[in-house]
From Swiss-Prot:
Source organism: Emericella nidulans (strain FGSC A4 / ATCC 38163 / CBS 112.46 / NRRL 194 / M139)
Purpose: Type-I myosin implicated in the organization of the actin cytoskeleton. Required for proper actin cytoskeleton polarization. At the cell cortex, assembles in patch-like structures together with proteins from the actin-polymerizing machinery and promotes actin assembly. Functions as actin nucleation-promoting factor (NPF) for the Arp2/3 complex. Plays an important role in polarized growth, spore germination, hyphal morphogenesis, and septal wall formation.
PANTHER family: MYOSIN, MYOSIN-3-RELATED
GO cellular component: actin cortical patch; actin cytoskeleton; cell cortex of cell tip; cell septum; cell tip; cytoplasm; hyphal tip; mating projection tip
Domain Myosin motor: 50-729
Name of the protein: Myosin-1
The IQ domain, residue ranges: 733-753, 754-779
Gene coding for it: myoA
Gene Ontology BP terms: actin cortical patch assembly; actin cortical patch localization; actin filament organization; cell tip growth; endocytosis; mitotic cytokinesis
Keywords noted in UniProt: Actin-binding, ATP-binding, Cytoplasm, Cytoskeleton, Hydrolase, Motor protein, Myosin, Nucleotide-binding, Phosphoprotein, Repeat, SH3 domain
Record-listed Phosphoserine modification sites: 371
Length: 1249
């Protein structure tokens, strides 16, 4: 989210395709032409909000306006605000609940315009840009102490660890260790100050290392400017580093026994400031977190023991006190403390005494070593030596911990890119400022210089270099302040300080006075003022006054050789690890001072940051009381000024949000123009500049939204860039949709094919079981009973459960429930019928019932109305094993009895599906059914009283029962079996392409395989010959010869009767007797089905009967075999029509007729005898195409298929034009080709390929 100092600017780092609403630029349409759907998402800065979320949207740009906006948002718990890509954060001093997992997930994959300002948005941008553009990233967090820099750094680490993915155990271990560095380094490097309860007293640059997949594989930490002076002294109400209080309060018993750990009140270094606790912080729990972090990092128990041994040594070292002896020299007051410190450091106690009270001095003469003298120290000097040793041990211990963390975080794979997080304490202005504040403020000046170079100066320089029209903005360049501090020529503050230390190194007071004299040479610098005992530097954050006293001693930053000799004499290897350098007694070179080290570290930091793409977080401290809801306007206004927020806003408003070289721009966005790309390939043949212009033109970006530079294209607003990225994402989205559509089409095609195969299989074989059951019924009857015609139809199936007792819901379920039919019973058969019911005093009468046969019982169910409500109950339940005999007659009637022989009379039943009932009962009894068929039906009318019912065959069409006799009609012979199953009506196969499953031609889009398959030609259907508009169509009939009227010269009636009329013509001969109809096979037809007749092309068969469903029953003339044959495969042979008798001669002309003139009589006679001429051809109308040539050897269909018939075609034989269209198959082919063309055009219109 930062500005770029390079051609590949930071603004290019916006994610592509993240902002759906950002595409509403230009004409407000996506590349695909659809209106923007997620337009509301883009309204985050336009909807009603608290103030403005981006300071560049302020109507008035001033420090006061920025202050008012930040205050308004702060009072409504909106602590984050943008300045373009820079995030401004105000410390709320309380938990707002904005760092939960749900909030974190809401920022995944989003650009800053889609979501409210947040530190997670900065982290998302940095991670996305690193992963997408393969550029190193860094986040620079700046602000004064207590503004929230450390918290922001932790939240960035939290976000990156959450979204960086990677399920591998090593990657997860790396994430855990990175997160564990926070509590560990905070405990050793943070402390409570007056302004901040968790102030970082060191600078930290954490560099997270990632592989090519964006997964963390390692990390590296560089620390800067540890405030080691805090170890030995703090001002009132401040504390030492957290670890001392955690260790003193929460140390386990083994450390208390081994290291003599006591409460913090017992140690001078932790009790001098009279502050032992931090509100809201549990030091014991924090110590446990520190131990856990050490374990996660991988510190062994021995390493942890050594770390805490050094902490105990430092605490006990602070309790060493000195008093003046008789000579005025320092003497140790309590030797036991010295002995315990020696035990902890594992050195000799005498050496400790000597190192703390005596200084070894060596004289030299002519470059040679001279005498060595022991110089006693006074109490002040002894205390300084003691504190120097404590500070050196802690400083080196902290460096060792950082190095140990880096050792554990060493990358475990190839490192592709990194994200750096800089957390360093900010600008400090105290009542008394010394060398520490000078170093801190110097580093902040360097960071401010980076910000100016990368965001302000580089922006203007690039516009000038690219000849871009814009409004220049004046800004303060703090390079002069950095030069004032660090330059050697002319000498700066650090150079003067080093010179004073070198010339007057023995006496601190003299060195300070020498330093003051050197500062006089800087008086001409406008950013410097030298005053009595102090000097003032005009920093970007304000004027700071530094006290000179003690600066030279702090700058020396070297441990006395006596103390180095002391620690190197330790028998503890860990102590040697902390102090690895050997004392070189002959080295005369000046060791590097503290200012040299901080200068080198700052320059290294700047070089590191310049190699990465920066993002910025500017933190602001709202008040000095660490109080929530309190906003000190004057303090915040001061921070706004020294952070340069106003200049940043003005630069942002006047500049361009995105810039990129022409080649990179074209490489990224060439897909958006049809003139620069085709099917994903780059096709532009011109130069990259014209290609970039073409892309912007085709994407309809307004001209005021961009400018073309010398080598780059500049886009003014980020919304325009997000629109381009959204279009690019839409391109890939469309490609994915097309692939998905093709795949889904294929799946639907495959599914449709499978369904058709299944449907065909079920149609061919699904009813076989039912047919077998039907044929079994014939076997059970055994030719003993006449059959009804409907019973032996070819379409008859034994379906079984006709009432639907087994169905869920509906009347069948109601009947099952009312009859109490167990759910464990399998229903084999059910139907409605009648039962003969005898009533007292009345003759028996059939009554409706429902018969239900299960695998265990036969239920006779009755339905009665009781109190106007239908009551369903089982009238009789008969176990199937109790049925001894089933009695039926040998006639076609539907009556039968179930002979049970119990205490109840046997039921006499009437059921139209009796044969099916017998069959299912036979199978339920496993073939043990005793079916008795005879001339009478026997049943027990009363228990033990056998009765018979006579069956009389008469002319009754319907069975009837009366007075013990059943009347029925004649039936089919008893040996009758079911007819062959009739074939269904043949219909044209529905193509798989119907419903736009696929393009015509099959799944590959090529020629359809169906097209190459021979299609049988259907016989043309005779149609009436079309007539002209003047003549109404009449049914075609055989012409009857009529006498020709005599030709007369006049229509007047003659008065002569002398002429005799000719006798009437003889009647026509009677038609010949019709013979059997025959048909010729046009194609081969083969079938294994017994009900179908196989034929070969050219074979003549006899037509037995025709069905209206497209099948004819035919007989083979050679074998007399009969079967069904498809009508479309046959051509009926029409017997030749005999020649009609010649017309009778015309009657003799009357004698009274006048003589014809000029031989007209001969002409008339010739016309009468000559055959009539053929009908004239239809004239070829202008603009009408000539009819195509007729196909070879067309079969005469005796009807003209011409759509505009000629009335003269009464002979039944069409004209050449009609003959060409006589083939129905040809006409259908033409129609199908026309329909296919129409469908193809429609599909091409629908398809966006």
């Amino acid at each position: 989210m930062g500005h770029s100092r390079r051609p590949a600017g930071g603004e290019k780092k916006s994610r592509f395709g993240r902002s759906k609403a950002a595409a509403d630029v230009g004409d407000g349409r996506q590349a695909g032409g659809k209106p923007q759907v997620r337009k509301a998402v883009f309204e985050s800065t336009k909807k009603k909000e608290i103030g403005v979320s981006d300071l560049t949207l302020l109507s008035k740009i001033s420090n006061e306006a920025i202050n008012d906006n930040l205050k308004l948002r702060f009072q409504h718990d909106e602590i984050y605000t943008y300045i373009g890509h820079v995030l401004v954060s105000v410390n709320p001093f309380r938990d707002l609940g904005i760092y939960t997992d749900s909030v974190l997930n809401s920022y995944r994959g989003k650009n800053r315009l889609e979501v409210p300002p947040h530190v997670f948005a900065v982290a998302e941008s940095a991670y996305y840009n690193m992963k997408s553009y393969k550029d190193n990233q860094c986040v620079i967090i700046s602000g004064e102490s207590g503004a929230g820099k450390t918290e922001a750094a932790k939240r960035i680490m939290q976000y990156i660890a959450s979204v960086s993915g990677g399920s591998d155990s090593s990657i997860q271990q790396t994430k855990d260790m990175v997160l564990a560095t926070n509590p560990l380094l905070e405990s050793f490097g943070n402390a409570k100050t007056l302004r901040n309860n968790n102030s970082s007293r060191f600078g930290k640059y954490l560099e997270l290392e990632f592989n090519a997949q964006g997964e963390p594989v390692g990390a590296n930490i560089t620390n800067y400017l540890l405030e080691k002076s805090r170890v030995v002294g703090q001002i009132t109400n401040e504390r030492n580093f957290h670890i001392f209080y955690q260790f003193a309060k929460g140390a386990p018993q083994k450390y208390r026994d081994s290291f003599g750990v006591q409460q913090p009140q017992s140690y001078l270094y932790t009790s001098r400031s009279k502050c032992f606790d931090v509100p809201g912080v549990d030091d014991v729990a924090e110590f446990q977190d520190t131990l856990n972090a050490m374990s996660v990092i991988g510190m062994s128990e021995a390493e942890q023991d050594n770390v805490f041994r050094m902490l105990a040594a430092i605490l006990w070292m602070g309790n060493i006190q000195f008093a003046e002896d008789d000579s005025g020299n320092a003497a140790i007051t309590d030797q036991s403390v010295v002995d315990f410190v020696a035990y902890l450091l594992e050195v000799d106690a005498g050496q400790v005494n000597q190192a703390l009270t005596i200084r070894m001095m060596e004289t030299s003469r002519g470059g040679r070593r001279g005498s060595v003298y022991e110089v006693p120290l006074n109490t002040t000097q002894a205390l300084a030596v003691r504190d120097a040793l404590a500070k050196a041990i802690y400083f080196n211990l902290f460096d060792w911990i950082v190095g140990r963390v880096n050792q554990s975080l060493t990358a475990k794979g190839a490192v592709a890119n990194s994200i750096g997080i800089l957390d360093i304490y900010g600008f400090e202005i105290f009542e008394k400022n010394s060398f520490e504040q000078l170093c801190i403020n110097y580093v902040n000046e360097k960071l401010q210089q980076i910000f100016i170079q990368l965001t302000l100066k580089a922006e203007q320089d690039e516009y000038e270099r690219e000849q871009i029209t814009w409004t220049p903005i004046k800004y303060f360049d703090n390079k002069v302040v950095c030069s004032l501090i660090e330059d050697k020529r002319p000498p700066g503050v650090f150079a003067a300080l080093n010179d004073a230390c070198a010339t007057a190194h023995a006496d601190s007071g003299a060195a300070d006075n020498t330093f003051v004299g050197r500062l006089n040479f800087l008086g001409q610098n406008p950013n410097f003022e030298n005053r009595q005992g102090q000097f003032i530097i005009k920093h970007y954050a304000g004027d700071v006054s530094y006290a000179v006293q003690g600066m030279t001693d702090k700058n020396k930053d070297q441990l006395l050789k006596d103390l180095l000799n002391l620690v190197q004499s330790s028998s503890n290897h860990f102590v040697h690890t902390l102090f690895p350098e050997q004392v070189n007694q002959d080295d005369k070179r000046r060791p590097p001072t503290a200012s040299d080290k901080i200068k080198a570290s700052a320059n290294d930091l700047v070089a590191t940051l310049m190699k990465a793409q920066p993002s910025y977080i500017r933190t602001i401290k709202p008040n000095d009381n660490k109080a929530p809801k309190e906003f000190n306007e004057s303090n915040v206004l001061h921070q706004i000024k020294y952070l340069g927020l106003q200049e940043n806003v003005r630069i942002r408003r006047a500049g361009f949000a995105y810039r990129q070289t022409f080649d990179k721009f074209v490489e990224r966005f060439y897909l958006l123009s049809p003139k620069t790309s085709y099917a994903g390939d780059y096709t532009w043949t011109g130069d990259v500049e014209t290609g970039a212009r073409q892309i912007l033109k085709d994407t309809r970006i307004p001209a005021e939204e961009y400018q073309m530079g010398i080598t780059k294209v500049f886009i003014k607003t980020p919304e325009t860039l997000f629109a381009l990225e959204a279009m690019r994402d839409r391109y890939w989205h469309n490609m994915a949709i097309r692939i998905q559509r093709a795949w889904r089409n294929y799946l639907r095609y495959r599914t449709e094919c499978a369904i058709r195969i299944q449907r065909f299989w079920r149609r061919m074989n699904g009813g076989l079981e039912l047919l077998k059951l039907r044929d079994q019924g014939h076997t059970i009857l055994g030719g003993r009973k006449e059959r009804r015609r409907m019973s032996i139809l070819g379409s008859r199936r034994f379906l079984g459960d006709y009432v639907g007792i087994s169905n869920k819901g509906g009347p069948g379920e109601m009947i099952r429930s009312g009859a109490a039919i167990s759910t464990s019973d399998d229903v084999l058969f059910s139907c409605r019928g009648e039962v003969l019911v005898s009533k007292f005093g009345r003759s028996s009468k059939p009554s409706p019932r429902i018969f239900v046969l299960t695998n265990r019982h036969v239920y006779i169910v009755s339905q009665n109305f009781v109190n106007n409500q239908l009551v369903i109950s089982s009238e009789r339940t008969i176990p199937i094993g109790a049925i001894k005999t089933v009695s039926a007659s040998s006639y076609r009637d539907d009556w039968f009895s179930l002979v049970v022989g119990g205490q109840e009379p046997d039921p006499l039943c009437n059921c139209v599906f009796k044969t099916e009932f017998f069959t299912h009962l036979h199978n339920a009894l496993r073939g043990q059914l005793n079916l008795k068929i005879g001339p009478e039906i026997e049943y027990n009318k009363k228990p033990g009283k056998l009765a018979t019912v006579k069956v009389v065959k008469d002319g009754s069409q319907v069975d009837s029962y009366k007075s013990g006799t059943i009347h029925t009609g004649p039936g089919e012979p008893p040996n009758s079996v079911s007819k062959p199953t009739p074939r269904g009506k043949q219909v044209a196969a529905r193509p798989v392409t119907k419903g736009k499953l696929l393009r015509p031609g099959g799944p590959g889009g090529g020629p359809s395989k169906l097209a190459s398959r021979p299609v049988p030609e259907r016989r043309p259907i005779p149609q009436p010959t079309p007539q002209t508009a003047a003549a109404q169509p009449t049914p075609a009939s055989r012409p009857v010869p009529q006498p020709v009227a005599a030709v007369a010269a006049s229509h007047s009636r003659t008065s002569s009767t002398a002429s005799a009329r000719a006798p009437p013509p003889p009647p026509p001969a009677p038609p010949a007797a019709a013979g059997p109809k025959k048909a010729k096979a046009l194609y081969d037809f083969s079938s294994d089905n017994n009900g179908m007749l196989s034929i070969s092309a050219g074979q003549i068969v006899e037509i037995v009967s025709k069905e209206g469903n497209g099948w004819w029953l035919c007989m083979n003339l050679e074998t007399s075999a009969q079967g069904w044959t498809p009508e479309a495969y046959l051509e009926e042979q029409v017997a030749p029509t005999p020649k009609p008798a010649p017309p009778p001669p015309p009657p003799v002309a009357p004698r009274a007729s006048p003589a014809p003139v000029n031989g007209s009589a001969a002409v008339a006679a010739a016309k009468a005898k000559a055959a009539p001429p053929p009908p004239a051809k239809r004239p070829n109308m202008a603009g009408r195409k000539t009819a195509p040539a007729p196909p070879p050897a067309p079969r005469d269909s005796a009807v003209s298929m011409n759509s505009q018939g000629d009335s003269s075609g009464a002979s039944g034989r069409g004209t050449p034009s009609s003959v060409s269209n006589a083939s129905l198959a040809g006409g259908l082919a033409e129609a199908l080709r026309a329909r296919q063309s129409a469908m193809q055009g429609k599909q091409d219109d629908d398809d966006d390929w």
